[in-house]
Every structure is written in C-alpha cells, then in structure tokens.
From Swiss-Prot:
Documented EC number(s): 4.2.1.20
PANTHER family reported for this sequence: TRYPTOPHAN SYNTHASE, TRYPTOPHAN SYNTHASE-RELATED
Domain of life: Bacteria
GO CC, alphabetical: cytoplasm
Record-given protein name: Tryptophan synthase beta chain
Matching PROSITE patterns: TRP_SYNTHASE_BETA
GO molecular function, one term: tryptophan synthase activity
The entry's keywords: Amino-acid biosynthesis, Aromatic amino acid biosynthesis, Lyase, Pyridoxal phosphate, Tryptophan biosynthesis
Length: 393
C-alpha cells in the first residue's frame, strides 16, 4: 500500500509496467524513511548550503519595469551551483540513491541542465551516471554535453523519434526497467509516475519557502503573484508549493507558445492539451485525435516536453493556478531586455516567465509585487541565441 497519495485529484498515478512497481514502492519508502531521519535531512541541507550555495538571492529589478506601481523581484536560482534550480532535487535524489544501496544513476536531459546537475551530484557522491539525451539536443547544447563528460558521466545520444526529451525519457525508462536492482532513475522534473512528482516537489520546495521569508523581510507582506516557466514544471512547483494555501498569491505558470499556440509548433500543454497518459502519469498531454503524442516545440530545449507534471494539471483543474503561454519571440525579447537593463543573462526557459511577468507589470493598476523564478542562467543558450539573432543583437 502506498502511504502517500498517488494522485492529485484525478491526475498522476503509476501507469507503468508491472515490473517497475516494486522499484517505485521502494523509492517511496526510502523517501518517507529519509524524511524522518535527522541525519539525512542534515546532510541534504548542508549540501544545499555549502555546496550548492543556498539560500539564493532575491533581487529587486531596478530598470526593467516602467510602471512605478510595480516591484518586480527575481528569485535567483540562476546563481545556484550548476546554473539552474535543477541542482536542488538532484542532490536529494542522489542521497536517496545511496540510501537504497544503489551505485548507478540513470537520467534523461533536454537542455542538458538536469544532466549537468546529475553529473555533478554523482561526481560528488561517488555514483556512476548514465545520461540519455535526444540527438537533436546533443547538438543544441554542446557545452552542457562537455560539462557532463568532464564530470565523469556517460552521455548516450538518442536518435529515436524526434531525438528530443520525450525520446530520452523513453530510453531512460527502458534502461531502468532492465536495471532497477542496481540503478536509480533520477527523473529530472515533477512529472512521471508516483512518487516522482511528490519527491521532486518536496526537494524543490525551499525555492518558495525562501521566497516567502525573503519577501516578508523586504516588503513586510506576501507577493501578489509568483511567476515561473513550465515545461514538466519542477521549478514552478518548487516556487508554488509554499503559496498554494495562500489565496491572495496568484500562481502563474508560463508554458512555451513557440511560434504561436495556433500553429503546430509549441509546447503549451495545459493551454492547448487534453487529458491522457504519458511516462507513467495521467495528466494534460499534447496528442492528436487518435491519441498519438504530438511533437512539442520550443526555442528552449528545457520546455520542449509534450506533457506536464500532474500537480500542475490539478492546480489548473481546480482553478488555483493560472497557466498562460509566451512565444519564442517574447522570450527572446525578455532574454535581451534583462541582459541590457539589469546585467543578468537568464536561461531561455526562465525568459518565458519573465516575458509574461513584464506584461503583468505593464497592465497593473495598483501597487503590485511580482516575483519571477529565474530558474536558470543563460550561459548554455548563448550560441543558440547568437544563431537565431545573428546581427540583430
């Protein structure tokens, strides 16, 4: 019997081959045992603080917003070791891997950020890492591939399907099915079968907890809105978790509208998708009338995923969080604007959240505090952006 809820309303669940159920049950048990173990929590917190660099800063933007009624803050996950929020939960799951007595880690990666975080945690904790990456993403994200190899991880390009994140997840799950006795599948987002969405949320929830404490200290009140980009949705759920029970705080998730949600080229799963099962969970997915998974698209490899974490599906369903979409063009504009106005180069993923937050700031008619989760830094995207913008910089 599962001790944790396996679902969020009708969403979530464990739609996996029978042979993986014991591995998922073992993971849930390890997670619950670890939660009650002071030495585990102490080690996790000490790694977050002394290795990863938490708490991360909360920066009030100075020049970005022209509306005098708006204060726009950035939660600086881009300053975390590894370059993005990914490091938080990866350290937690890597510690769980050791706790379960396993020596190997299997992971998938899109932008390469989760792969880098997995590689650094495995290097630190003496685990062997096998990282699956879509062949197309291997090309798009060369610096991250080199980083992973430098830290001792094996990077396996996946040519199947469209050669992107979805295909990498399929291969990683196939590997895990064959090797779950010795290897832990370190899922990189708040999606997939139970207990992954819950574990990933809990190991990212310090993002929202720190945000609450920092904004109370700076402003003496909670923010009016927290805004985060949503691919699978791990940085967003980490930001939202501590505010779900605060009805005065708007939770805004920003999906990739790609070349426009009216085209076929986007990844706006909640905004345009329908309910179905992908990678072990019932959630919103992008599928055609026959139920075939459609290809998602985004300028940012990390948002290019045709499903979404089940808790986001649930928060949308009950109306607690709102989900919108920002186009490639809007994200690229926000990317350049933050660099020019504040001297901070954000990841293309985070630029989607920023783009929508800037629209919210323009429209605000009363005193408003907005916090954007700046989930990662843009170093990994520079070559990609230069290719797109060319001489227009």
């Amino acid at each position: 019997m599962n001790q944790l809820d396996t679902k969020f309303g009708e969403f979530g669940g464990m739609y996996v081959p029978e042979l993986l159920i014991p591995a998922l049950d073992q993971l849930e048990k390890a997670f619950l045992d670890a939660k009650e173990d002071p030495s585990f929590n102490e080690e996790f917190l000490s790694l977050l603080k002394d290795y990863a660099g938490r708490p991360t800063a909360m920066t009030l933007t100075r020049n970005l917003v022209s509306n005098p009624k708006v204060k726009l803050y950035l939660k600086r996950e881009d300053l975390l070791h590894g370059g993005a929020h990914k490091t938080n939960q990866v350290l937690g799951q890597a510690l769980l891997t050791k706790r379960m007595g396993k020596k190997e880690v299997i992971a998938e990666t899109g932008a390469g950020q989760h792969g880098v975080a997995t590689a650094l945690a495995c290097a630190l904790l003496g685990l062997k890492a096998r990282i699956y990456m879509g062949a197309k993403d291997v090309e798009r994200q060369a610096p991250n591939v080199f980083r992973m190899k430098l830290m001792g991880a094996e990077v396996i390009p996946v040519n199947a399907g469209s050669g992107t994140l979805k295909d990498a997840v399929n291969e990683a799950m196939r590997d895990w099915s064959a090797n779950y006795d010795t290897a832990h599948y370190l899922l990189g987002t708040a999606a997939g079968p139970h207990p992954f969405p819950t574990i990933v949320r809990e190991y990212h929830r310090m993002i929202g907890e720190e945000t609450r404490a920092q904004i109370m200290e700076k402003e003496g009140r909670l923010p009016d809105a927290v805004v985060a980009c949503v691919g699978g949705g791990s940085n967003a759920i980490g930001m939202f978790a501590d505010f779900i029970d605060e009805p005065s705080v708007r939770l805004v998730g920003v999906e990739p509208a790609g070349k426009g949600v009216h085209t076929k080229e986007h990844g706006a799963t909640i905004v345009t998708g329908t309910k179905g099962i992908l990678h072990g969970a019932y959630t919103f997915i992008m599928q055609d009338k026959e139920g075939q998974i459609e290809e998602s698209y985004s300028v940012s490899a990390g948002l290019d995923y045709p499903a979404v974490g089940p808790q986001h599906a649930y928060l949308h369903d009950i109306g607690r969080a709102e989900y919108v979409a920002a186009t490639d063009e809007e994200a690229l504009n926000a990317f350049q604007l933050l660099a020019r106005k504040e001297g901070i180069i954000p990841a293309l993923e985070s630029s989607h959240a920023l783009a929508h937050a800037l629209n919210m700031a323009d429209e605000a008619e009363e005193e408003t505090i907005i916090v954007v989760n700046l989930s990662g830094r843009g170093d990994k995207d520079l070559a990609h952006v230069i290719n797109i913008l060319g001489d227009d910089l």
